[in-house]
Amino acid sequence: MAAACGPGAAGYCLLLGLHLFLLTAGPALGWNDPDRMLLRDVKALTLHYDRYTTSRRLDPIPQLKCVGGTAGCDSYTPKVIQCQNKGWDGYDVQWECKTDLDIAYKFGKTVVSCEGYESSEDQYVLRGSCGLEYNLDYTELGLQKLKESGKQHGFASFSDYYYKWSSADSCNMSGLITIVVLLGIAFVVYKLFLSDGQYSPPPYSEYPPFSHRYQRFTNSAGPPPPGFKSEFTGPQNTGHGATSGFGSAFTGQQGYENSGPGFWTGLGTGGILGYLFGSNRAATPFSDSWYYPSYPPSYPGTWNRAYSPLHGGSGSYSVCSNSDTKTRTASGYGGTRRR
């Protein structure tokens, strides 16, 4: 080597040494790693709500993550979003992200987040490490539907709307209020249907007062079951010849007893309560949605794999869906952030 690199071959020896250095140092520095990509060369990203990014230096993150907006993150969850590289603005890559959204929602602020290969300032990123963070806002139509929903569903919509915008502490208080309301409803139902209330006799009757007692205590069918009002057991045959003689008195007494809160009052009350506490419980009745935990399981030897979240995690949903839901292609625009 020394003999070959004479005074006239100094340039050749320098190139040969540089070549040997690149052959040995390149793989060590990851220059030939197929997972190391120049971000500007990435043309498109297809991201899924139930998958995680790859990782090398940091922990993996969800490929799709809602971070806020006027509609909140629980009202609607897009399943797949595709982002296209729209060019370089002199600072970083700019993206256009599209998906099918309910006509009540639109994208707010969006940003593509990728893991730098060596650091957060590296122009090269790890393949598969990019995810999208987005805000979900209401459209004008969505705001109109929200207002109409509040007018139509009354107390249920108001309570759910309050729950949606309140903090976690206030949610606990609203849950306590709900329990108190349900207990009150149970008490009303008990008083209407199950409690055998005592009613005073009518102010005037042309028959002797003992006729009512005779009808009630000489009935061959016996007294009503414990816990139920006697007037709900219906007319009962006495099994005696006095039936014809005291029939009008029995009818008058029964008519008086049924004049209080009875079957039709309970039926109307049940219908109103069923309407208020039925299926229309959400403040944003547009669609169902679920999302998964924001942190994947950690397993050794899986640094460069895309994770899928475990099922059974915390979720949020809206039970009030619209069968006439319409969708359209929505777009969001934003830049890049390296982590």
From Swiss-Prot:
Record carries keyword Amino-acid biosynthesis: no
Residue stretches spanning the membrane: 174-194
One GO process term, biological-process aspect: regulation of store-operated calcium entry
InterPro entries per UniProt: SARAF (IPR009567)
Cysteines engaged in disulfide bonds, as pairs: none
Keyword rRNA-binding: no
Record topology, Cytoplasmic segments: 195-339
Entry superkingdom: Eukaryota
Topology with respect to the bilayer: Single-pass type I membrane protein
Subcellular locations according to the entry: Endoplasmic reticulum membrane
A Pfam family of this chain: SARAF
Skewed-composition ranges (Polar residues): 318-330
Subunit structure: Interacts with STIM1; the interaction is inhibited by the interaction of STIM1 with EFHB.
Function: Negative regulator of store-operated Ca(2+) entry (SOCE) involved in protecting cells from Ca(2+) overfilling. In response to cytosolic Ca(2+) elevation after endoplasmic reticulum Ca(2+) refilling, promotes a slow inactivation of STIM (STIM1 or STIM2)-dependent SOCE activity: possibly act by facilitating the deoligomerization of STIM to efficiently turn off ORAI when the endoplasmic reticulum lumen is filled with the appropriate Ca(2+) levels, and thus preventing the overload of the cell with excessive Ca(2+) ions.
Family per similarity comment: Belongs to the SARAF family.
Name of the protein: Store-operated calcium entry-associated regulatory factor
Organism: Homo sapiens (Human)
